[in-house]
């Protein structure tokens, strides 16, 4: 069950689809509906995805979701309960290629973010970010289903040595945990 590969495949599909190219959707605002409809079809690709978002760097105050085009501050505050918009935007803008992070104000969410190069110019940074919003509870249930370990016994979730979730809310390294029958220590993909 390689959820990371599924998310990567979606990012690759978006990157090559003409709907998402700035030259295309800027021709007519109705073309923005094609972006929204296309994003909606990807939501069901993975059981982990709660929301799928597209954020263009050239339009830093807006994003596209699987439901609509929305103001970034309004979406973050109303849907994800994130009020520190600039902090979130800075987290995004620090990403090159791919990263997973937990927003400071939303420890119950994991954001898988792919930087997309949509203009075809390969020697520059990306034009947009594709974000998958994954609730920690949904990821824990997924891990429980695969591993058989009850989600309440999962102390922390790591991906490639990066802490994505900790029950205590504090940062720990894997070496600080004692391996026992209540904890899964594993490496690899989601």
Language-model regions, residue ranges each:
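A general secondary-structure junction signal
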Residues: 11, 54-58, 159
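Solvent-exposed, extracytoplasmic
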Residues: 34-46, 118-165
